[in-house]
Amino acid sequence: MNNTLMKEMLSRYGKLTLSGIHTFIPNKEPKEYLYDLMHDYPDRGGKGFRPGLCIATCKAFGGSVKDAEFSAITLELLHNAFLIHDDVEDESFNRRNKPTMHQLTNKAIAINVGDAMNALGLYPLFQNKYRLGEKLSEIIFLEIQNLVTESTEGQAMELGWRLENRIDLTEADYFRMILKKTCWYTCMHPIRIGALIGTKGYIDKKKFNRLGYFMGAAFQIQDDVLNLVANEEEYGKEIGGDILEGKRTLMLIHLMENCTPKEKLFLQNYLSFPILERKQDAAKYILELMHRYNSIEEAKNTSKFLAGAALKEFYTHFSQLPASEDKDFLENIILYMINRNY
């Protein structure tokens, strides 16, 4: 794995996208509790996977950075809007080594900022028609529309499980949920959009679905693993937060399927409490159970298997393309998704 190339290109495309985001955020009132806050999460320095995947795929298929720029900006605006809303919904305390927006302000202001960023994401899409033409721009718009729909449906599934305190979930339920919540907006649509732009619409976008799904699932599972075992400073969020929030991760589902009836009853009782009433000692005990039943190791193995499947799909659809640093970047980012520490 070429870490140097991958990090350099993520940084390059991330900076380009961030610069574009700043140009689209209005410089007018009300600044203090809206427009200035819209710079906050993007400026904290995320990984930049989504714009990186979009731009690199576009270039690998013969397009240019300029062709993909507006779509990449939209993807990152929507991503940060989702993060603001997710932090409110999960009652999270930290994001990228800083207090979450609703902790810095309040929930009402954070929700409003997220709403405004979602709306702002439409503006770059409108600009696409001047570079890509109306027909292709409309196709890209529909891709974004489906991205938002799939993501919110997946989030609804997960929030509903927590509300109903579901303890009967299977791994198949989990994979259906992350397909919607994570895979479409993290990998499937960024790759599809990049390929559509790079080929000027002359490609079957559906052939990238398996690649994006395997990549997105590997990414999400690794993210869930890191929430339990990562260095908090590197990870940027509170370690073990997913247990406190009651998220139905692959590890929690594996644990519930393999633990004793007494331990399962303990889990059910723990998850029935409101988030702020859940005790750290109980969360630590659940983490110990996950280690005892090899739930974390099983999740790591699943993530590696999915990354291997993603690589096979990548070679199927990208091997015929000319050699380029963007093509190399896309191959390396699949490996990075399961080897990363943050």
Q: For the regions a protein language model found, what residue spans apply to each?
A:
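Mg2+-dependent prenyl diphosphate-binding active-site environment of isoprenoid biosynthetic enzymes
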Residues: 25-265, 275, 335
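Double-stranded RNA-binding/processing signature
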Residues: 3, 82, 327
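Mobile late-domain/C-terminal helix-loop "cap" segments
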Residues: 265-317
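N-terminal amphipathic/basic leader segments beginning at the initiator methionine
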Residues: 1-25
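Hydrophobic packing residues in well-ordered alpha-helices of helical domains and bundles
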Residues: 6, 10, 14, 68-71, ...
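Hydrophobic, well-ordered secondary-structure elements that form the walls
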Residues: 252, 310, 330
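Surface-exposed helix-capping loop/turn segments at secondary-structure junctions
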Residues: 131, 315-324
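Short, amphipathic C-terminal "tail helix"
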Residues: 306, 321-342
